[in-house]
Amino acid sequence: KSSMITEDSMSGVRVVYPTHRNEEQMGILLRAPEPDDRAIRFVLDSWCKTVAAEPPWNFGSTRHTPPPPHPLLIYEHDTILKKIIHKSTITLACDPDDPDTVWGYVCSDGELLHFIYVKSAFRGFGIGGCLLRSAGIPKGKMMISHRTESLFTAFPNIRFYWNPYRMIYGT
């Protein structure tokens, strides 16, 4: 099967059907978060917890010193993320019948992928790929500011280039 998205346009939001891995044709509502949206808190919380569980500078290295404790990682990363998200584009993947139910999101800045996340119960339905395509990042080499083992597992055929300074200093 080829990977494709069919869309139904609605005012400012899109319902997409990623047909490649979504046999049941589960619709996905793609939308931007509102400034006071509780989804922003979900984005910050899930992003920080993932980074604490899978620190980007950790894998593939031998540990000579213990990693920072999770509470410190979460606190410091939350500070970084609050700066990043105001300059970035966030797209939420939601339940079309309940736009407040968020299944996942992507955060990008132009051709830079900051982070992509899909709740574990909704992985394998093509939501992550749909979010990645919605970000408009060119195929092939992809610049990322955050790297996690989950990212490389979910997208094994994409060549990622990690630039952690983009996470700290922005674009």
Describe the function of each predicted region:
Residues K1-S9:
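Short, Lys/Arg-enriched N-terminal segments with co-localized hydrophobic residues
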Residues A121-P138:
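Conserved acetyl-CoA-binding loop-helix of GNAT-fold acetyltransferases
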Residues N22-E24, P96-T101:
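Short, solvent-exposed loop/turn segments that connect beta-strands within catalytic domains
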Residues L92, P99-Y117:
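Conserved beta-strand in the GNAT
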Residues I137-M167:
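Conserved GNAT acetyl-CoA-binding A-motif
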Residues S61-I90, D95-D97:
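Active-site rim helix/loop that mediates acceptor-substrate recognition in acyltransferases
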Residues D8-I74:
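Short amphipathic alpha-helix that is part of the acyltransferase structural core
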Residues P33, I116-A121:
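Hydrophobic adenine-recognition pocket in adenosine-nucleotide-binding enzymes
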